[in-house]
Every structure is written in C-alpha cells, then in structure tokens.
C-alpha cells in the first residue's frame, strides 16, 4: 500500500512508497511546498512533465533506504489542495485509532 505524507513528514521517510500533494516551489533545485513547509527533493522531478512554479501536483516517491525517486506526477486543480489536506488528516486519524480507511488488499 502506498503511504501518504506531507512536506514535514517526508523528511523522516526512509523506505516504501508515498504520495504528497504539494505545489512546485522551485524547479532547479527541485523543491515542493505545502502548508507544513517545503521539501527539497534529493532527486529530479519525474521526466516528461511541463510545470511552472505554483502548479499543484500529486507526487509519487519511492524510497529504498538510501535514495528516493520521484516516479510520477499528476497535475491537479489548485482547489483540491484543501480536499487532499482533509483526506490526509482523516487517514492519519484512522491510523492512530487503528482503523483502516482502505484495505491494502482491496481489489
């Protein structure tokens, strides 16, 4: 199952896959931001995408313990940033309470 992070929590991630909803803060060096702060990627953005500073994307990252890779970008309308923040908050609450919102084995 792919995890969810924000710019503050991704800094402590070492392994696994995660998705972050964030704005492009800088292209060189690659940097993203959300309401928790900014995060400078340790890898380039996934290739094949046109982007401008201020664009909102869902960023998919893979961590293998020693490196990170941005494998996919999905552009989304800026109005969805608040919706994603609410979903992330609800997911974290469910995890804290020991509940799963989506089963990792669901088809």
UniProtKB/Swiss-Prot annotation:
One of its GO terms (molecular function) is DNA binding. It comes from the Eukaryota. Its main location: nucleus. Expressed in the germline. It is found in: Nucleus. Disruption phenotype: Embryonic lethality in 40% of animals, reduced brood size and high incidence of males phenotypes. Presence of a mix of univalent and bivalent chromosomes during diakinesis, impaired double strand breaks and chiasma formation and defective chromosome segregation. Delayed double break strand repair with an accumulation of rad-51-positive foci in early/mid pachynema in meiotic prophase I during meiotic recombination. GO terms for biological process: chiasma assembly; DNA repair; DNA replication; positive regulation of brood size; positive regulation of embryonic development; positive regulation of meiotic chromosome separation; positive regulation of reciprocal meiotic recombination; protein localization to nucleus. GO terms for cellular component: nucleus. The keyword DNA damage applies. Keywords: DNA damage, DNA repair, DNA replication, DNA-binding, Nucleus. Essential component of the RMI complex, a complex that plays an important role in the processing of homologous recombination intermediates. Component of the BTR double Holliday Junction dissolution complex, which is involved in homologous recombination during meiotic double strand break in the germline. Plays a role in double strand break repair by positively regulating the accumulation of rad-51 at double strand breaks. Belongs to the RMI2 family. Component of the RMI complex, containing at least top-3, rmh-1 and rmh-2. Component of the BTR double Holliday Junction dissolution complex composed of at least him-6, top-3, rmh-1 and rmif-2, which is involved in double strand break repair in the germline. Interacts with rmh-1; the interaction is direct and is required for mutual stability and localization at nuclear foci. This is RecQ-mediated genome instability protein 2 homolog. It comes from Caenorhabditis elegans. The lineage of its organism: Eukaryota, Metazoa, Ecdysozoa, Nematoda, Chromadorea.
């Amino acid at each position: 199952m792919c995890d969810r992070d924000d710019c503050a929590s991704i800094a402590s991630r070492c392994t696994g896959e995660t998705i972050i909803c964030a704005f492009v803060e800088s292209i060189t060096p690659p940097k993203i931001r959300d309401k928790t702060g900014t995060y400078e990627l340790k890898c380039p953005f996934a290739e094949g995408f046109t982007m401008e500073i201020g664009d909102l994307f869902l960023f998919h990252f893979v961590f293998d313990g020693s490196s990170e890779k941005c494998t996919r970008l999905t552009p989304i309308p800026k109005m969805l940033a608040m919706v994603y923040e609410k979903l992330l908050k609800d997911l974290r609450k469910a995890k804290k309470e020991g509940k799963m919102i989506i089963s990792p084995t669901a088809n």
